[in-house]
Amino acid sequence: MRELVNFDSDERLRVSVEDKALVSVSQKSGKTKQSKKEFASETEAKKACAKKEWESLKKGFILQDSEAKAGKASLHVYIGGGYTGALSFTSVKDEIYVYKCGGQKDGDKHSDILVRLDKSGAIKEQIALPKPLAWHAEYASENLLLDLDHEIYIFEPNEAKFREILAEQNVKKSSEIASFICTSNDVAVFGMFGHIFTFCEGKISKFSEYKCSTKNYVPILCAALSADASMLALCTKENELQILNAKNGEILSELRAEFGVLDKIYFLDDETLLIRQYLENKLFCLDIKSAKVTKQPWIKDEYLRASEFCVEAGKLVVIDQSRGYAINLKSGNAMAEFRLDHVVKSCEAKFIDGKLAVRTDYGCFSLYEI
């Protein structure tokens, strides 16, 4: 059933289109109210229905659909405060933490926060961040790792406290302002100010360093961990990528090919990387042994411009602004083609419990069935 729920007022609202009419059914305190409004066409009625849902979301309602089919949203929560490039979120056990950009200061304090949701979409807590701009958020070893304006912090949910890694590890700020966080197998590797650390079982260890080249004055930096967290793929130069031992920093191989500047990489397996070209947003595969760049048959032309992509359990989702494509990596077959709601230009996407989780620049956090 698709309905809007307000946990604060205990109101439930269902909006639907019947022929050329918008039908609204509201339930609150045991009372039911129904209204019906006619429109000139079914198209106009559908537009009014979408507008009604959006207005309700902004008023604190949560959209839930227990019968959502593939490519459809089973959850919409209005978070607000979307900021292009900083749309981070991550899941922690049965909860989801979503970054919200406050966009203003209260005295000397920034109003940027982490919104803690349960799996029903109910907002349980809003946590003030020690710094603004959460560019990235990941989960490992029962902790959140946050890239706050290129400084890494660890948030311990059980203790409800932030750890400032810059001070803990006595890291000195440098001209290497680009940073990263990547996780796999409950291990995190992160980099800031030219230093690379691993975070495993609650312990932090430095194991390598990096120096970024630039392209059009923008630092080149992206990284990924292999499935077992034994290898780190690191790109800091145009047409060049290193594979490091993620425990001791040993360079296992250096790959050089005409793939340009990369801004996102992912280990498909121990021998293949899925890579995305900076600005072009084109997806390719890179063979780690031969350093050959290939376009696999499942990389269709219609989703070569990947503004976002994510992979889990043999499934690839490619997003081009508001269009989404789900692909079975084993067969190469398309599983679903769908449109994302509430996207202006960009979003961040991850898999959470088999569903596609999306944080959009228009202010929503959503779950889609895949």
Residue ranges and their predicted role:
Residues 104-111, 147, 190-191, 235-237, ...:
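Short, solvent-exposed loop/turn segments at conserved positions within beta-propeller repeat blades
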Residues 72-82, 122-128, 161-173, 204-215, ...:
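A short beta-strand motif characteristic of beta-propeller blades
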Residues 78-112, 132-133:
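Beta-strand-rich domains and repeat architectures in extracellular enzymes and scaffolds
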Residues 83-90, 130-142, 171-184, 215-225, ...:
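Repeated scaffold domains used in trafficking and secretory/extracellular systems
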Residues 9-35:
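Short aromatic-glycine-(Arg/Gly/Cys) micro-motifs in beta-strand/loop hairpins
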Residues 115, 153, 197-198, 242, ...:
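WD40 beta-propeller blade core
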Residues 96, 144, 187-188, 232, ...:
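Hydrophobic beta-strand positions that form the internal "hydrophobic ladder"
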Residues 118-121, 156-160, 200-203, 245-249, ...:
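Short loop/turn segments that connect beta-strands within beta-propeller blades
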